[in-house]
Every structure is written in C-alpha cells, then in structure tokens.
Amino acid sequence: MTEDLRISMIQSHIIWEDREENLGYYGELLRRVSGRTDLAVLPETFTTGFSMDVEKQADTMEGQTVPTIKEWAKKYKLAVAGSFIAKDNGKFYNRAFFITPEGEEYYYDKRHLFRMAEEDKHFSAGDKRLILSLIHISQPT
C-alpha cells in the first residue's frame, strides 16, 4: 500500500435481479483495479439492482454475496464497500458492507429508507449508526 489512499468508485451497468452474473461482472472489474486501489466502492444493491422483490432477491450473510466479497478483498488485497439486499432474522435490509483484505467486516443497515421508491414498504430500517476510520487501510504494512 502507498501513503495515499487510492479509491476506485465503480459505477457500471447492473444486470437486473441476476446475482450470479453481477458477482462475476464486478469480480472482474475488481481484478482489473487490483494493485492500483486500496478501496473499491461498488454501487448500492450491486448484486440485484434496486429491486423491491426482496423475498426473491435477498441473500443471507452466509449465502453467496458476503463470502464472495471476502474472497475478493483477500485475493485482490483491497477493501471493498457497497450494499446488497440482506435477509436477517426474517427481515429484509439494504445492508452496506465494508470488508478489508485482512478480513475485518463492518455492516450497516440503511436507516433512512427512500419513501418515494416505496423502499420503506419492502425493507426494514436499520437502527444503528456506523462510523469507520479509513486511515489504517492506507498505512504501509
């Protein structure tokens, strides 16, 4: 790592409601930026698009999404942030994640749901705040 924090904001086409295709696509984009970035930020609900079909599109923490992100972070030696539709204890959340190459994991459930898109009718609001310091990921090892 360098003394400067190198961030890649990845905004690209999301294949609607196709987790497997999106994971493959974004995995390839992360491979391309590896070695040139410390933190890759993926789009909101990057695995499915901003779907309201939460029962069909949600993934659990043990499902396909989180283990794949952990693998990317370790393999490409970069932190990865973004969000996905999560199912947890029978509820659905727009869950943000921040996973480091060293395996540190942080999660935040969106608290202020977008009423105009009826997000509040399909998702549960989070009840905790999360504040992270990014200083440690830019420090030389």
Regions found by a protein language model. Name each.
Residues 17-20, 56-61, 116-122, 138:
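Short, flexible loop segments at the rims of nucleotide/cofactor-binding pockets, characterized by
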Residues 87-138:
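Active-site catalytic loop in hydrolytic enzyme cores
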Residues 19, 27-101, 106-107:
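Cys-nucleophile CN-hydrolase/nitrilase-fold catalytic domain and related Cys-dependent amidase chemistry
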Residues 4-14, 18, 95, 107, ...:
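Active-site-proximal beta-strand elements of phosphoester/diester hydrolases
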Residues 2-3, 49:
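Short, flexible turn/loop "capping" segments at secondary-structure junctions
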Residues 12, 45, 111:
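Active-site metal-binding loops of divalent metal-dependent hydrolases
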